[in-house]
């Protein structure tokens, strides 16, 4: 299923523009102009995802019949009709885009960034999607260095239903209320390609091909809150807004099992269990109202899981509108460990759902709020936005025994958008590499930039003159901000860059049209996979991902190991002895023990030990760590480079660094 189309300019454009001035006063949301001409997205032969690639979901826009046509059977508007009744999701436009944001064009000054044409996946292919995640790029057991992207069906961009054509105009009939014969509108859930409200779609990172990966077929319409990938056990997690269950899914798309927070999680914090009430979305029942999310079959708020994120051997997740953050351990076999733990209750200006969670490599947890779901019949508003925050928490250091949580009580907040209050979050957040002083991506620093989705990001009448120098004001998309710039810094956010989702700037009043954001950010180097030993390498130097013979003398030894507990988990400081005289100054580390995750920073201070983080292990367990010792200057040249490899058995201390129970 390729996405084969040209620019946003279409033959319907004149009619769409005219809709703005009709007596009904509706806002025409169909795209009539594009920032990216000829931005066709077809199946590729190379790759569509690179380090730093930024995937964003959002509403694709609408299409309305040509008002100038006198023949309604050829697309015209029947006399006396309300244009809104004849306005549909534009299945030819994108609900998912993958942006190249490697060069932002200059220092941050609050400006709009003009990116190369993004890769696009249309609503006709996948319908409306929100949650995103990447896998690890392993293909047929071989690491390729190019991941696949996954996108989940959503109701957060509205629920639209239709019945068969009744007035012989060649189009179905829009319905506000449930009625016999109603079905989901084309472009809602990708039903034309076998999709539904519980579908997770896979976008191949090399070819761009789109396929159905998994289906939670019990989901009646609320859709999926978000997705997470566990690289240690190579499995996925998806939060089900219909039942409140967290589904565990294998790499082939098979549903394995579930975790029920309402029943099994809440009692761990002294709360009464809450079972699913069994409510479903029935679009053929009179009680269904497309403009009232309370009729959509969402599970109760107390058990409604929105965001999911795997970190440090645990799955973190958010619950409810007055958001709480919880976590549950993932056992060595990948199963739910049965140890749910309340982490914190979010402190923010509004009791809004946290629809996305991200972690950096410094121990911070980032949360993005999204305003309550809405669904205006004219497609103008899908969320009550303008008060949603992006905040971050860190572990108490040292831990304060007088507080209930191991996290600090008051989070740090980012200034999101230019409107008054700077709280324009649309519910997506992730981390990006660092950008240098000229706005160029620096992949040597892993989590130095916060990226988040938002509405009306550059709209502020009081600052209009200054903002105009940086591009259009009606920007609904992504804000990129150096992670150090928490409030009161960067207020207003002239220290940020902005990217528009659809390249259309004549829609200042829409809300909730942007969804999630996810960055492909490999942080442990990208050695790649080599099928044969390249020339020029003598023992004991081998390409980083090539397994050397087992009869070579050791090229590296460990003189000492010291362990510390940090907010990230167990830290091991390695003092290395360079037997081979390589002169290395960097390491890459990976776990060779199933169920255990090992990470290493991409930089090393001269004279200091080499540091690795270990998570997912049992106290006292011996963890086999694969080390690659190399010179960064060799790596920076590109291509193959010498690497001294060894497997190091580390016996971990008989203590847990996962934090104390409350």
Where do the language-model regions lie?
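Extracellular acidic, Ser/Thr/Pro-rich low-complexity tracts
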Residues: 576-582
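Bacterial N-terminal signal peptides
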Residues: 21-34
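Surface-exposed, short loops/turns at beta-strand junctions within beta-sandwich domains
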Residues: 613-623
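N-terminal secretory signal peptides that target proteins for export/translocation
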Residues: 1-18
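Short strand-edge motifs at loop-to-beta-strand transitions and within beta-strands
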Residues: 608-612
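Sequence/structural signature of beta-propeller domains
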Residues: 41-552, 556, 570
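Short, solvent-exposed loop/linker segments at the N-terminal edge
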Residues: 562-569
């Amino acid at each position: 299923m390729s996405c084969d189309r040209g620019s946003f300019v279409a033959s319907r454009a004149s009619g769409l523009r005219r809709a703005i001035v009709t007596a009904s006063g509706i806002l025409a949301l169909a795209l009539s102009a594009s920032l990216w001409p000829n931005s066709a997205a077809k199946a590729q032969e190379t790759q569509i995802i690179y380090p730093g690639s930024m995937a964003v979901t959002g509403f694709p826009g609408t299409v309305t019949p040509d008002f100038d046509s006198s023949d309604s059977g050829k697309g015209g508007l029947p006399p006396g009709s309300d244009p809104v009744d004849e306005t549909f999701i534009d299945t030819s436009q994108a609900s998912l885009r993958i942006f190249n944001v490697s060069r932002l064009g200059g220092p941050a000054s609050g400006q709009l960034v003009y990116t190369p044409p993004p890769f696009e996946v249309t609503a006709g292919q996948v319908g409306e999607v929100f949650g995103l995640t990447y896998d690890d790029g392993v293909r047929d057991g071989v690491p390729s260095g190019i991941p696949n992207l996954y996108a989940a069906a959503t109701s957060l961009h509205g629920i639209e239903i239709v019945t068969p054509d009744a007035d012989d105009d060649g189009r179905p009939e829009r319905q506000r209320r449930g009625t016999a014969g109603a079905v989901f509108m084309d472009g809602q859930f990708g039903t034309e390609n076998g999709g539904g409200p519980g579908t997770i779609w896979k976008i191949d990172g090399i070819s761009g091909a789109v396929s159905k990966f998994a289906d939670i077929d019990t989901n009646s319409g609320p859709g999926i809150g978000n997705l997470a990938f566990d690289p240690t056990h190579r499995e996925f997690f998806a939060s089900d807004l219909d039942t409140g269950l967290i589904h565990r899914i294998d790499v082939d798309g098979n549903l394995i099992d579930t975790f029920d927070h309402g029943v099994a999680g809440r009692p761990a914090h002294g709360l009464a269990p809450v079972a699913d009430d069994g409510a479903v979305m029935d679009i053929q029942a009179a009680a269904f109202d497309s403009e009232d999310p309370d009729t959509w079959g969402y599970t109760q708020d107390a058990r409604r899981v929105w965001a999911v994120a795997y970190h440090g051997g645990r799955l973190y997740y958010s619950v409810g509108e007055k958001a709480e953050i919880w976590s549950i351990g993932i056992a060595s076999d990948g199963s739910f460990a049965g140890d749910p733990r309340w982490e914190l209750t979010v402190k923010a200006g509004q009791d809004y759902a946290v629809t996305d969670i991200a972690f950096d490599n410094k121990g911070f947890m980032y949360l993005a709020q999204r305003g309550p779901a809405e669904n205006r019949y004219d497609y103008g508003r899908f969320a009550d936005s303008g008060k949603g925050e992006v905040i971050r928490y860190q572990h108490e250091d040292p831990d304060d025994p007088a507080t209930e949580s191991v996290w600090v009580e008051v989070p740090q907040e980012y200034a999101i958008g230019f409107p008054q209050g700077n709280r324009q979050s649309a519910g997506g957040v992730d981390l990006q590499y660092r950008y240098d002083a000229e706005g160029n991506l620096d992949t040597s620093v892993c989590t130095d930039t916060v990226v988040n989705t938002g509405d009306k990001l550059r709209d502020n009448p009081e600052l209009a003159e200054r903002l105009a120098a940086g591009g259009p004001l009606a920007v609904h998309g992504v804000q990129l901000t150096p992670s150090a710039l928490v409030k009161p810094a960067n207020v207003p956010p002239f220290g940020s860059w902005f990217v528009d989702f659809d390249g259309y700037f004549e829609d200042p009043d829409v809300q909730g049209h942007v969804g999630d954001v996810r960055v492909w950010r490999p942080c442990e180097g990208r050695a790649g996979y080599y099928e044969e030993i390249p020339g020029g390498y003598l023992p004991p130097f081998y390409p980083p991902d090539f397994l050397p013979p087992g009869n070579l003398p050791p090229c590296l030894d460990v003189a000492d190991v010291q362990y510390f507990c940090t907010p990230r988990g167990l830290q091991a400081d390695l003092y290395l002895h360079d037997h081979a005289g390589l002169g290395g100054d960097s390491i890459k580390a990976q776990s060779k023990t199933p169920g255990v995750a090992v990470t290493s920073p991409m930089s090393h201070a001269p004279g200091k030990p080499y540091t690795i983080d270990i998570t997912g292990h049992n106290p006292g367990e011996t963890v086999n760590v694969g080390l690659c010792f190399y010179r960064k200057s060799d790596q920076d040249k590109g291509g193959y480079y010498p690497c001294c490899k060894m497997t190091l058995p580390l016996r971990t201390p008989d203590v847990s660094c996962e934090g104390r129970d409350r």
